[in-house]
């Protein structure tokens, strides 16, 4: 019988398992089987020229080994003794007046998967005690994440190089608890996308739909967004990471309602991210040109998903998506030539300029992708994930086709490349802006598990958009 998300998340975040995993990776990288792992949580920071606090975001590697979201905290992991300790801020009477009582040591020990909880005032003493008991072994830390008052003087060796790499490589493969967190983030985000579909026809401005999305996420338990949401109407959708989210949905020049809204948005649930993109017609029905492009992008995604399993080279999946785009644009008459010629010339990059996807976890663009931004092939330059897919890794699959004049015009004006694009046919598609469809999937040995439940068939989206 399958364990439900609720059952899984009723347990503790598996910090101890993660600490062991990172320690094992340190050993695999040739740095020994003993020593202390030392990490600091994010500090409380103040807004410049203000007495207000900056929004807090816990350091991801610290959270991975602690499960602790508290600011100004620390951790140590004694590799040989297999002892994980977190240090949390003590009670400050002056702060209690304003903020209430903080978490106690006893409460923290009940909540977190650790062996001991101490006050942050005891960090240096604890480190010194370890050195005394173990003969001054090695400490592993991240160079720019050690507070000035922390002293490693008693240690024989300080390693600032391997810990960050070991933690980030360990984070690529998710355990069942992490997948449950990602699944919950996707469930909540998918419902919020549906709420936007249902409001699309009546909305007057991009920000209204953003507010509906964020409100739906918050009411379901996600206070934070994984990234700044993208609510791009009409031709704004040709900008990949459009940020304004504040334009009217009726064009001020033509008086016409814009065709579509591209929604790239995902909630963060207990530090784990969803990253979902959908497109909804603002009239309730896709225009013929919009539907043609949508169908191509959906085929790009379906073809990519069909290839996914552990060990498959991500570059091959990405290339397949480009080929599907080429075939679709040839059929519409936007492109001219043969599939092979267009692929080799990189013409599809004019319409699909970004990578197919990336790893997902506590960061939207999660660790382990090994991108190569120096790649001279424009098809692969912005591919954030390279190499074979890892079983248990979580990836986004997000093909798209865009009609961005800034990108396409140089192709049109090129003596070598312009002949492959039919400018007359292309002219009918500028108003589509862009279409992207993005799901989050767990890579398995024999395929994938799609965490994203937001509808993506065009008929389903149109039905939701026109519901009364």
UniProtKB/Swiss-Prot annotation:
Enzyme class, first EC level, given as a word: hydrolase
Catalytic activity: Release of any N-terminal amino acid, including proline, that is linked to proline, even from a dipeptide or tripeptide
Annotated binding of Mn(2+) 2, by residue: 264, 275, 438
Pfam families in alphabetical order: AMP_N (PF05195), Peptidase_M24 (PF00557)
Disulfide bridge partners, by residue number: none
Residues that, per the record, bind Mn(2+) 1: 275, 398, 438
Family: Belongs to the peptidase M24B family.
Its biological purpose: Catalyzes the removal of a penultimate prolyl residue from the N-termini of peptides.
Single GO term (MF): metalloaminopeptidase activity
Gene for this chain: PEPP
Alphabetical keyword list: Aminopeptidase, Hydrolase, Manganese, Metal-binding, Metalloprotease, Protease
Annotated source species: Paracoccidioides lutzii (strain ATCC MYA-826 / Pb01)
UniProt xrefs under PANTHER family: XAA-PRO AMINOPEPTIDASE 3, XAA-PRO DIPEPTIDASE
GO BP terms in the entry: proteolysis
Protein name in UniProt: Probable Xaa-Pro aminopeptidase PEPP
CC cofactor note: Binds 2 manganese ions per subunit.
EC code: 3.4.11.9
Cofactor field: Mn(2+)
Metal-binding as UniProt keyword: yes
Keyword Hydrolase: yes
């Amino acid at each position: 019988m399958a364990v439900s998300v609720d059952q899984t998340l009723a347990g503790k975040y598996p910090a101890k398992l993660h600490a062991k995993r990172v320690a094992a990776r340190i050993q695999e990288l040739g740095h020994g089987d003993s020593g202390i792992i030392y990490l600091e949580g994010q500090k409380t920071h103040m807004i410049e020229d203000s007495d207000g606090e900056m929004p807090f975001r816990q350091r991801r590697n610290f959270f991975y080994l602690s499960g602790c979201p508290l600011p100004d905290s620390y951790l140590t992991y004694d590799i040989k003794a297999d002892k994980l300790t977190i240090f949390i801020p003590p009670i400050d009477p002056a702060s209690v007046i304003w903020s209430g009582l903080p978490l106690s040591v006893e409460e923290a020990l009940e909540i977190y998967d650790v062996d001991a909880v101490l006050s942050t005032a005891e960090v240096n003493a604890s480190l010194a005690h370890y050195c005394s008991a173990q003969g001054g072994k090695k400490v592993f830390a991240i160079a720019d994440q050690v507070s000035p008052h922390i002293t490693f003087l008693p240690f024989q060796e300080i390693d600032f190089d391997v810990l960050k790499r070991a933690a980030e490589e360990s984070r690529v493969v998710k355990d069942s608890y992490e997948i449950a967190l990602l699944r919950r983030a996707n469930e909540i985000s998918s419902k919020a996308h549906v709420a936007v579909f249902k409001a699309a026809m009546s909305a007057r401005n991009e920000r209204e739909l953003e507010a509906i999305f964020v409100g739906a996420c918050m009411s379901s338990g996600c206070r934070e967004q994984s990234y700044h949401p993208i609510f791009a109407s009409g031709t704004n959708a040709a900008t990949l990471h459009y940020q304004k989210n504040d334009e009217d949905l009726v064009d001020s020049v033509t008086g016409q309602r814009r065709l579509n809204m591209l929604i790239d948005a995902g909630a963060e649930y207990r530090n784990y991210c969803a990253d979902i993109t959908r497109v909804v017609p603002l009239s309730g029905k896709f225009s013929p040109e919009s539907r043609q492009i949508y169908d191509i992008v959906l085929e790009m995604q379906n073809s990519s998903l069909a290839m996914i399993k552990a060990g498959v080279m991500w570059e091959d999946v990405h290339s397949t998506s480009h080929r599907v785009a080429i075939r679709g644009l040839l059929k519409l008459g936007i492109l001219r030539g043969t599939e092979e010629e267009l692929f080799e010339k990189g013409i599809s990059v004019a319409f699909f300029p970004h990578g197919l996807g990336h790893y997902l976890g506590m960061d939207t663009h999660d660790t382990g992708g090994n991108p190569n931004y120096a790649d001279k092939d424009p098809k692969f330059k912005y591919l954030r994930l390279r190499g074979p897919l890892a079983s248990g890794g979580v990836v986004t699959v997000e093909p798209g086709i865009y009609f961005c004049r800034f990108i396409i015009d140089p192709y049109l004006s090129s003596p070598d490349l312009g002949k492959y694009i039919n400018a007359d046919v292309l002219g009918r598609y500028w108003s589509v802006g862009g279409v992207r469809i993005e799901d989050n999937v767990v890579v398995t040995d024999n395929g994938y598990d799609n965490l994203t439940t937001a509808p993506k068939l065009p008929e389903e989206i149109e039905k939701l958009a026109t519901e009364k």
